[in-house]
Amino acid sequence: MKFSESWLREWVKPAINSEELAHQITMAGLEVDEVAPVAGEFTGVKVGKVVECGQHPDADKLRVTKIDIGEEELLDIVCGASNCRLGLTVAVATVGAVLPGNFKIKKAKLRGVPSHGMLCSFSELGIDVESEGILELPEGTTLGADVRDILELNDVAIDVDLTANRADCFSIRGLAREVGVLNRADVTEPTIAAVATSIEDAVSIEVKATEACPRYLGRVIKNVNAKAETPIWMQEKLRRCGIRSIDAIVDITNYVMLEQGQPMHAFDLAKIDGGIVVRMAEQDEKLTLLDGNEAKLNDNTLVIADQNKALAIAGIFGGQESGVTSETTDIMLECAFFAPDHIRGRARAYGLHTDSSLRFERGVDSTLQAAAMERATQLLVELCGGEVAPVVAVESEADLPKANTVELRRSKLDGLLGHHIPSTDVVEILTRLGCAVESTDTGWTASSPSWRFDIAIEQDLIEEVGRIYGYNNIPNQAPVAALNMNDHKEANQPLKRVRDLLVDRGYHEAITYSFVEPEQQKLIVPEIEPLILPFPISAEMSAMRLSLWTGLINTVVHNQKRQQPRVRLFESGLRFIPEESAENGMRQEMMLAGIIAGTRGEEHWDIATNTVDFFDLKGDLEAVLELTANELAYEFKAAKHPALHPGQTAAIVVDGKEVGFIGTVHPELERKFGLNGRTIMFEIEWDAINTRVIPEAASVSKFPANRRDIAIVADEAIASGDIVAECLASGGELLTSAKLFDVYRGQGVEEGKKSLAIALTLQSVERTLEEADITSAVDAIVAAIGEKFSATLRD
């Protein structure tokens, strides 16, 4: 919103200068983008009148004039403007005047004729107006007066970048109201009295779309002079607000829009067939707009029509056929309230952006129409003449906006602002803003004024109180907080440590959406019904995830489609399990998941390129588990999972509890997701592995270690991990490690059995072990294995 400071000061007179006014407006939340003078810097330019005007003897395009500037002598001035004529009141730069650009006026001769000054155009005075020829001032302007004073050019134009919620400030009226509140200054509005009617003509008005147009006013004015000149004071006010003067009737409707905040439109009455109909457009209905372009309308567009055709896009743009021209004598003046929801976005749909659409789509005061109609009528009769008919009004009270009544609690006000504002100040601020305020036991209730439809909740009122009171008036006060050290147990395993480990092992961390496609998720977790979002981003993101695998599998597919031969990803995040007994009916669990696909390593000339398998991922997961627990705390047990291959799946068991799964993706799942080749993945509950064994210092033995290898024959169904665990449990304090280094099946081993080669390392911190010590420990291990698993020592 660009406005003239002098126009604003006609309404309200704060005791501050231009710079202070701009700063004050900005601090109140209406950011000032620019403050610019309305004209260039010049001196010595006076009002004059052309009393003689003749042709230059030696130049066809020059005229020799005598100018009266209210002094004893007339000035001889040569002028080349085409509109220079006898009796014209002009702006005269006298000898010694300085024009913008430090251009000094001196006595001169033009083709031999003396010239003692210059008749100025708008551009020569640094005034941004598109016009040909010299500036024409109103007849009767005081001769010799300073043009800066006559045109009130000691003024600035202030451009304010309004936020979407402050549509009430798209007018001088609204800005004056705001400045008045900030400065506790009275606002003087122009007197708007009902214009006396002299004829009874009326146009019938039918509103078919009352929800989109709850109020529509129309008035006939006959015998207007459409060729009347717009007075320079109105042209200047429009110009300083960024609007170009067109003709008197259009200028008056624009003037009322800027002054009151109510867009209006004038129709040529002779071009309206049978009355006005406010309706929705028919699909692909055509309308030629004022700019000459043809619009093909959508059926969600509100139009002003007559009985046969559309006349205008309501609140946005008029039609060419019903537009006012210089030949127009009778008009119908429109003033309406259009609901923002039915205007918003429509202008952009047709590639339009108008001052009218900007105001209507953000919201116009729904009580303003009658006053705006009388104001426009008043100006039309004054400037263009005419005979006025009564206003025809059609309203749908049920569809008009209602005032919002909002509760404001003292505790909430103090809490959000961090400062106690006296109750009398709070009531005064809200009252000056136009709210109807009532006290309650906990604070106040405030009913918003008709022009502040953005005040809807308690926080809106708090914002208003804070900004009018002045944020600078709220003292700086550092928050007081107890600095308590967070409890951090040494046994807690940081997630960052696990992330770093996986990154070091060649993984990339993925972050996928918590919302997944329901059918895909059902393939992975068919036994649980997920939480379905009522308003999802899309149908493909409508279910809360039950597993991190859905997102990771899709990420692998995405990378494989982009020719990535090797994919290694991990993710940590929440899964969401519906559970009636949980808070909000949902249990949230932190999970850690990983997935690998493609080649085992980067392509290398000296290393064979192999595809990843189950044990590659198992080794990486074991490295993670070794960070969090000792070797005896976790194990892998053969299991089944609907998303994993039946013969290549293991449950992850920690301290006897099943906390996750690892395995190769099920072939059917692989096909439906579109995976390219073997893919292995794991998922484990983070809470089950987020503790670690606290390291204990141990003496480093100076005595030699002894290794003994044993080969154990056991049933195929017995897990090798169980046998290794039994070795460690029964080996006593001398056994420092037990590692499986070979598995053999074949000749010499019965069918249905396997031979496990295990390396046992024995060492003492006190002495060198004797053979008897070693033999005794090994025999105890073999005996324990034989007793528990019916396994034997291989010959």
Curated annotation (Swiss-Prot):
Coiled-coil ranges from the UniProt annotation: none
Cofactor (UniProt): Mg(2+)
PROSITE patterns linked to this entry: B5, FDX_ACB, TRBD
Domain tRNA-binding: 39-148
Cystine connections: none
CC cofactor note: Binds 2 magnesium ions per tetramer.
Binding-site positions, Mg(2+): D454, D460, E463, E464
Reactions catalysed according to its record: tRNA(Phe) + L-phenylalanine + ATP = L-phenylalanyl-tRNA(Phe) + AMP + diphosphate + H(+)
Pfam families reported for this sequence: B3_4 (PF03483), B5 (PF03484), FDX-ACB (PF03147), tRNA_bind (PF01588), tRNA_synthFbeta (PF17759)
GO molecular function list: ATP binding; magnesium ion binding; phenylalanine-tRNA ligase activity; tRNA binding
Similarity annotation: Belongs to the phenylalanyl-tRNA synthetase beta subunit family. Type 1 subfamily.
Family annotation (HAMAP family): Phe_tRNA_synth_beta1
NCBIfam families xrefs: pheT_bact (TIGR00472), YtpR (NF045760)
Protein name as catalogued: Phenylalanine--tRNA ligase beta subunit
High-level lineage: Bacteria, Pseudomonadati, Pseudomonadota, Gammaproteobacteria, Vibrionales
